Amino acid sequence: MKKMNLVTAALPYVNNIPHLGNLVQVLSADAFARYSKMSGIKTLYVCGTDEYGTATETKALIENTTPLELCNKYYEIHKSIYKWFNIEFDIFGRTTNKNHQDIVQNFFLQLEKNGYIKERETEQFFCNKDSMFLADRYVIGECPECQSMAKGDQCDNCSKLLNPTDLINPKCIICKNKPILKKTNHLYLDLPKIKTKLEKWIKNPDTSKNWNTNALKMTKAFLRDGLKERAITRDLKWGIPVPKKGFENKVFYVWFDAPIGYISITKNIIKNWESWWKNNDQVNLVQFIGKDNILFHTIIFPCIEIGSEENWTILNQLSSSEYLNYENLKFSKSEGTGIFGNDAITTGIPSDIWRFYIYYNRPEKSDFQFMWQDLMERVNTELIDNFSNLVNRVLTFQRKFFGDVIETIEIQNKFWKQITPKYNKILNLFKKTELKSALKEILKISSLGNKIFQDNEPWKRKNNSPQETKELISNLIYLIRDLSILMMPFIPETSKKIQQFFGNSYQFSTKILGTKSGIKKIEFTEILFNKLEQKKINNLKLKYSGDKNMKENEQAENLPIAKEQPENLFREKVLLRVVKINKIERNPEAKNLFILKLDDGTNKDKQIVSGLEGYYTEEELLGKHIIIVDNLKPAKFRGIKSEGMLIAAEDKNKNFKVIIVEDSIQNPIAGERIILENDQNKDLACPPKIDINKFLKANIVAENGELKINGINLILENSKNKILSKDIPNGTVC
């Protein structure tokens, strides 16, 4: 069994400021490395800037500077942004380090010695106007696979690896003129010759079992289509020189040298670097990448290592993610679309909030849309109303009624039997790099803690049963300590602050989870987070939209709804949730209006007003689970605020029935989202506030006793059970 975790995040290009989409990988690796260290595993987290290649050379031309000066500038920018986000690298280096050239050239010489390098005369694009051969990224054109605009090495849209000559209507990126083909010599890595060894390695059950499904599928498809020789040299000035006669004016292709940067960056800092990089039996190499980098990490880099015929530490565990997009657009460095690292710093929103939201929506299986409204709602409900609320209410109650000193507690076995089995599940999710799921399981424990507090009503029992109440609160305090440990990989500054409340030195070890000792006193407490306000979010959304995006958004808003499929409108505009009716009051100003107090899973009552007199008695509805439009703009009815609208079915005879979600049949959970059946396992954004007309245009109907949109069933997100309309089998939903 491997005893050490070597963790890497894809080396970011140092030609621009990183945006939130770029940060997914370094943050993911950071959370895993923190978990690994808390678990007592010897861990090294390595990253750095990828500084050679076409992207840097072209950016330097644009900024009228040298490539090295450009790299120096952006390296410092990257470092400062990662520091603000509390990314705890063990090593953060550069591929322009003193060891990089030697290691890259040694890999090449070893590959050449072993017969895996071929020299080919080839035709390459040449720009007559600029009098230069054009490296792959100096050529742009239409992708032959998906017809999107692409550069000459890879299509960002469909991830297909390309050669510049594959592009349709190619153009020089500098002058935009059409280049000509001209003969030149280049060196190629003979991937077909390494294929047998590569496939043997991939088929080893200890290898690919730890890869994401999308990474394995993409790699197998690439192998199935047949490996081709891959050029490893380029006609550039900025890069690692090729140590071969006749190639003095060429450099290595950036994706030949960049993965080797993981090794050279380590060697540049650590003397015993070989104990990490030449120790495949003991070291578990865990790599975090985006889906556009999959083939370079599962094909190219392993082939370089295998072809060298040395005992390099090779990929064991791969965590690849999909794209994080911005408000229905892609983050784009070149177009300036989306939130960049320096923007996040100036928003006034703490780094732990940004971290939380990115982990909560980590695009593990499908692309995710960053939405400002969703940021506010997820943070306010899950991070603050759930997690932060538990910490505040328990510690405040202890100090107010029982003082700062924590007495030796009586362990409540019933309490901990609900909690401790969940710890192993969470740690296993961390181990498998399923970070989003791990975070959501932690939040479920926090929600359970709130429920235990609420159900036991300590504010009522503190006088009649003071000892039992003390024990309850003390057990909850140790639960909070455990939550601070589990949340440490995600929100480290907040976790440290919680442990500062207890006055102890930091105790971030998974070994103490579930233990009930070590906390003597509460030194102080304070609110962990302030809620995000709607006005602030609106201003930030406007500030970071840009004129072009604002116009596009306005055009999109003004498109006739008739052209939009109802299921798409529902997916993008409507948020339905299950709620439980806890209390019913009559509006004193209008007796036909019921005021419903609802449990929506946030431990904070939600209120809606509905005209149900004559249709139902209070007794018929109390305790029932119903469905509400949760993103309806608030309104007042006879002076009473309503924060949503329940949904009901109506048939052609005007019979009207509220949609009841049956406990015994459908197993609903308060706060659970209602989704389309074909949206299972998708990361869905939280839609903005809407008016009633927008909801009605989603055209939900009851059809043969089931709620549907355009023939697609509505289901409970967790249990996947269909939403039923037993009393009105066929009709409209309003």
UniProtKB/Swiss-Prot annotation:
The note describing how and how many cofactors are bound reads:
Binds 1 zinc ion per subunit.
- Keyword Repeat in record: no
Keyword list, A-Z: Aminoacyl-tRNA synthetase, ATP-binding, Cytoplasm, Ligase, Metal-binding, Nucleotide-binding, Protein biosynthesis, RNA-binding, tRNA-binding, Zinc
Q: Where is this motif: 'KMSKS' region?
A: 330-334
What PROSITE patterns does the record tag this protein with? AA_TRNA_LIGASE_I (PS00178), TRBD (PS50886)
Any one GO MF annotation of this record:
tRNA binding
Which residues make up the binding site for ATP?
Answer: K333
Per UniProt, residues of the tRNA-binding domain are 570-675
**Source domain of life:** Bacteria
Predominantly, its location class is: cytoplasm
Indicate which residues form the motif 'HIGH' region.
Answer: 12-22
Question: What are the binding positions for Zn(2+) in this chain?
Answer: C143, C146, C155, C158
What cofactor requirement does the entry state? Zn(2+)
State the compartments where it is located: Cytoplasm
In terms of InterPro entries, this protein maps to:
aa-tRNA-synth_I_CS (IPR001412), Anticodon_Met (IPR041872), Met-tRNA-synth_bsu_C (IPR004495), Met-tRNA_ligase_1 (IPR023458), Met-tRNA_synth (IPR014758), Methionyl/Leucyl_tRNA_Synth (IPR015413), MetRS_core (IPR033911), MetRS_Zn (IPR029038)
Could you say which enzyme class this protein belongs to? ligase
Q: Name one GO cellular component term.
A: cytosol
Q: Name one GO biological process term.
A: methionyl-tRNA aminoacylation
Is-annotated flag, keyword Mitochondrion? no
The UniProt function text for this chain reads: Is required not only for elongation of protein synthesis but also for the initiation of all mRNA translation through initiator tRNA(fMet) aminoacylation.
Under the subunit heading, UniProt states: Homodimer.
Write down what this protein is called: Methionine--tRNA ligase
UniProt organism field: Borreliella burgdorferi (strain ZS7) (Borrelia burgdorferi)
